[in-house]
């Protein structure tokens, strides 16, 4: 848990350090709100990519639990493996949707 907190501290300090540089790129258009919209696009993209990170974390947990289940009951390995693969494919769809939404936010919005 402390490594997750360390990672979030590094990310937040990086954002704090680079926020003025990002805002200064559109300093001329801050009066009409375009600069804030520019910042909002990238903040929104970062939030959508949190879904992809959560998917990766949960896929690791589900795979670890499947390995433990097979270790406890080796006869059930084919059923556990097929169920795990279907579950991981459905979970990966969420990460792909998050990536698509992020790309749309950056290039279309």
Curated annotation (Swiss-Prot):
The record marks 92 as: Reversibly protonated during proton transport. This is ATP synthase subunit c. Belongs to the ATPase C chain family. Dicyclohexylcarbodiimide (DCDD) binding to the active glutamate residue inhibits ATPase in vitro. It is found in: Cell membrane. It is a multi-pass membrane protein. Coiled coil: none annotated. The chain crosses the membrane at residues 42-62, 88-108.
